[in-house]
Amino acid sequence: MKKIKHWWIGAGVALATAGASQIAAAQSNVSLYGVVDVYVAAQKALGKERAWNVSPGGMATSFWGIGGREDLGNGYAAVFALEAFFQPNNGGTGRFAGDTFFGRNAYVGLSTPAGAFLLGRNTTPYYVSALRFNPFSTSFAFSPVLNHMYKGVSGQGLAGDNGWNNSLLYTTPGGSDWQASLIYGTGNKAGAQGQNQWGGNAIYAHGPFSATVAYQQVRYDKTPGDLNAQIAGFSLQSAVMAAVGYDFSVVKITALYQYLHDGIDSGDLNTHSGQIGASVPIGNGALLASWMYAKSHGRGDPIRSTWSVGYDYRLSKRTDLYAAYMQDRATGYSSGNTAGVGMRMAF
């Protein structure tokens, strides 16, 4: 049991930072990698009608990537990664219509004894912390954490994407209990508020205990070109997260807290949210459960509550089958729910 326990969480984080594995490689190389994930589901989104779908990304968003490393000697190496999302259910590119082609990561950089420095489009440290401390990891279909953060309603979600354009990412060297990252994104034009877009995280893991803190701040123009703003007059968002996890062998427990502050001309919005999750090894897989609750102050004080249960069965080192159910309720919307089964394969 110990051999397979919680493998999907580690796999999810590894897939989220797949290009970064090139940084730690010992020799010069170029590799092709990715994941294909499709599921069948009965889906009823908040406030909408039910539909039967064959959809991409039940447990992980499908993508392919090319990553490379050139050893420069003395502990230095040049690295790159180009990673594109796709939709295996219909052969489409991106996560959605209009998504940028290399939307996952697209960077070049240096790996040094002092850490890695990457320039381009980079996955945010905030997102990496969120994956590490929720049992559904990379699942945008079934993870309450990712649904609240990146599919927010009534203004409760994070602003922008989980990857930042025009950014510099620094990550400390591996090999210790601590890992930290800092990211800064520019607006790429004089006077752009987006030039002040920054964040970071720190993750500690030793034995069965792990913890993280993460922060990010985004600034946008009142009518931004790179943010689909649902709230007029939005200009700033600050987000902070703290989470802990403990692996008792028979069950791994995670707890997460998030605070969001939105600066809005018509009145600020402040949101407190928390998640409790568990993963229990059963057979050649695991039972997953997670619940997240969010309450805002301002703009009608909306509330959202979401819970999910699922079972992830490991067929091999690279392939798994899963079944999951999510229930979603939010102020001002009819309830939503999703039930689905799917298959995921990494390469």
Descriptions of predicted regions:
Residues Q27-Q43, A51-T186, G194-N196, I203-S210:
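Outer membrane beta-barrel
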Residues G65-G67, Y107-G109, L169-T171, N201-I203, ...:
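Outer-membrane beta-barrel architecture
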Residues Y76-A78, A114-F117, D177-A180, P208-V213, ...:
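Repeated loop/turn-to-beta-strand initiation elements of outer-membrane beta-barrel proteins
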Residues L158-N165, T186-N196, I264-N270, H297-R304, ...:
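Solvent-exposed loop/turn segments connecting transmembrane beta-strands
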Residues W198-S308:
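Detector for outer-membrane/organellar transmembrane beta-barrel domains
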